[in-house]
Amino acid sequence: MYVVSTKQMLNNARRGGYAVPAFNIHNLETMQVVVETAASMHAPVIIAGTPGTFTHAGTENLMALVSAMAKQYHHPLAIHLDHHTKFDDIAQKVRSGVRSVMIDASHLPFAQNISRVKEVVDFCHRFDVSVEAELGQLGGQEDDVQVNEADAFYTNPVQAREFAEATGIDSLAVAIGTAHGMYASAPALDFSRLENIRQWVNLPLVLHGASGLSTKDIQQTIKLGICKINVATELKNAFSQALKNYLTEYPEATDPRDYLQSAKSAMRDVVSKVIADCGCEGRA
């Protein structure tokens, strides 16, 4: 069985003191680079997709592609719903074979966040599907979820325990100063808050908004309990910039099989660096 749940992946990471990277994929080339690089480095990875990605590719198509590539490379993969907000949408994808879900109700008041998340957890656990939820909000935009910086807030450690116990989630995404998108300057991460959250919450912790973070910051968050690192914008930027550069240099290029190679090479550098930063090479 090559398409797996994230639950065992993250529990292994927690015990082993490393993190599993979750790469948001946007097209076939992104998927190829992530899987090929992970297989070559014998690293566990999570294939993540926002609602927009599943709409773009088609849920059945995406599931079939993940399954085929996992078998081709003899490498276990998890496919994960990132920042999904609608119960019916999640339920449909779970019934299609998805075994890892992030329900994002972090924009709701605390009690409503608990209620919405618990509804999803109760459904998903019937299918042995692991569930991640977020307490606190990151600034920036992820797919169609946008949070103004002024509205972003950090995770409260005491509330985090209540939230985890009331919902029954399998992992908790925390807000400690990261944001979706790339950073104009290095963010000031609240490491002491993260350490407190780890003391209050007995679950694998997840860091969103990791694109552009320094190796030092990533590794420090892992030491303090982060077991899953999300990367999206960094891959998109590498792909887009390499493609622009190639077509500027070779404006007559017309064959995507040729000009997409530069974009894949740029993404490969990102994926291999993130895997190294997470300390998960050789852990698959």
Swiss-Prot record:
Keywords annotated in UniProt: Galactitol metabolism, Lyase, Metal-binding, Zinc
Entry-linked InterPro entries: Aldolase_TIM (IPR013785), Class_II_FBP_aldolase (IPR050246), FBA_II (IPR000771), TagBP_ald_KbaY/GatY (IPR011288), TagBP_aldolase_GatY (IPR023955)
Sites where the protein binds dihydroxyacetone phosphate: 181, 209-211, 230-233
GO molecular function: tagatose-bisphosphate aldolase activity; zinc ion binding
Pathway terms, separated by semicolons: Carbohydrate metabolism; D-tagatose 6-phosphate degradation; D-glyceraldehyde 3-phosphate and glycerone phosphate from D-tagatose 6-phosphate: step 2/2
NCBIfam families: cbbA, PRK09195.1, PRK12737.1, tag_bisphos_ald
Biological process (GO), any one: D-tagatose 6-phosphate catabolic process
Catalytic activity annotation: D-tagatofuranose 1,6-bisphosphate = D-glyceraldehyde 3-phosphate + dihydroxyacetone phosphate
Native organism: Escherichia coli O1:K1 / APEC
One GO CC annotation: cytosol
Cofactor: Zn(2+)
Function: Catalytic subunit of the tagatose-1,6-bisphosphate aldolase GatYZ, which catalyzes the reversible aldol condensation of dihydroxyacetone phosphate (DHAP or glycerone-phosphate) with glyceraldehyde 3-phosphate (G3P) to produce tagatose 1,6-bisphosphate (TBP). Requires GatZ subunit for full activity and stability. Is involved in the catabolism of galactitol.
Name of this chain's protein: D-tagatose-1,6-bisphosphate aldolase subunit GatY
Cysteine disulfide partners in this protein: none
Enzyme nomenclature, EC number: 4.1.2.40
Cofactor: how bound: Binds 1 zinc ion per subunit.
Family: Belongs to the class II fructose-bisphosphate aldolase family. TagBP aldolase GatY subfamily.
Subunit structure comment from the entry: Forms a complex with GatZ.
Location of the active site: 82
Binding site residues for Zn(2+): 83, 180, 208
